[in-house]
Amino acid sequence: LTIRWVTYPSRQELPLLAESVQATLKEIGIKVDVNCSADFQSFLDSGEWDIYAGAFVCAPTGDPEYFFTTHCLDESSKNRGGYHSDKLEELEKEMKSTFDTDERAKLAVQMTQTILDDNAFIFASHLKMSIVSAKGVTGLEAHPCDYYEITVNLDKN
């Protein structure tokens, strides 16, 4: 058995994850051909892959719907593997018309459980990020979501 693994080098953890999987599966006789390329999109487009490992921010604005609409639905632009779930599509219809944050959170839990039950996605790592700034930068604080480091408190003296 050979698994064709596609990833890219611009996120430091992705090549390391590929190498770890490759070494671990080799121990049980499974070969993993790793293709780590900045041109990963060409490989995805060709369909000549079995596993695509990519990094993304699941909830950049704190709203749980983002991940599902970008990655998990029939019309999602990043649904690389062509995943489909009637249940998930129905839950998303409900999510679209639900505005209460507690209810949206409950729907998000159901949606998450659906993709986990289907083994549609494997969440394998978490990015370790360092923030470095030039001398004189003040008010820069790390935040779990990419968009919230730039605040009214950020300044350069």
Would you name each region that the model predicts?
Residues W5, A23-C72, A108:
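Periplasmic binding protein-like
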Residues F43-E48, F68-S97, H126-N157:
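Short, solvent-exposed loop/beta-turn-alpha elements that line the ligand-binding surface or hinge
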Residues L16-E19, A23-E27, S42, D86-K93, ...:
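Solvent-exposed, polar/charged alpha-helical surfaces in well-ordered, non-transmembrane soluble domains
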Residues L1-A23, E27, N35, Q110, ...:
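Append "and occasionally in soluble cytosolic enzymes with long acidic Gly/Pro-rich linkers
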Residues E13, C36, F56, R80-H84:
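Alpha-helix N-cap/loop-to-helix boundary motif
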Residues E13-L16, F43-L44, T61-P64, S133-K135:
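Extracytoplasmic/secreted cell-surface and envelope-processing proteins
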Residues L1-P9, A55, F99-A134:
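Bilobed periplasmic-binding protein-like "clamshell/Venus-flytrap" ligand-binding domains
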